[in-house]
């Protein structure tokens, strides 16, 4: 499935989506296992930004704080182990947005993780604190060898 990045998405103009529009800073990422255990995949605290645009586009970048530089100093080259570590501590993707009630659907058009391109990433959204806090919860999926539910808490910054 190829989702174009031009034109307005189905979410554009929706009153709930209008409350999401802006830039958000990641303050917490909980990965909750089926046994109730909680891990923090990108450390505690993680680093991340999420932006929703008025036309229904989203983009996010999430990483572990304090990631080491790749010694080669070259954007596309470097030792394989360092590149693997960099890949394993960063997530980035862009999508068109659709809504089903307060479930936000990211129709992924590009991603650092190529398996997500063309996928629909569903996030159950809850706004609180006068729309200054956003909690996005994903349906369970496998990560680091276990089924887990991802719950990301964001703070509005712009």
List each language-model region with its residue ranges:
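Lipid interaction determinants
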Residues: 1-94, 99-158
